[in-house]
Amino acid sequence: MSIKLINIGFGNIISANRLVAIVSPESAPIKRIIQEAKNRGMLIDATYGRRTRAVIITDSDHIILSAVQPETVANRLNSNKEILEDTLEEDEEEEE
């Protein structure tokens, strides 16, 4: 099993396998999730002081704040999947 990594801005990288959701930070429930994570010590601020544009929720209940748009993070995740799928297809062709 290969490890897939996603750049979430400013040189910060997370494991795609641990990702549960990428959401916008504007809604009240997400703001509540951020505050609860901060109180539990499970908040990771990767914004470098910039405005939070994406909130990333992981399977370990960590909440990661990013200054990159959610759509951008999702596109990076999808491009990683396409690269992996192309690699798998090439490996299958070589085996034949």
From Swiss-Prot:
Disulfide bonds: none annotated. InterPro entries: RemA-like. Belongs to the RemA family. This is Putative regulatory protein Teth514_1762. It comes from Thermoanaerobacter sp. (strain X514).
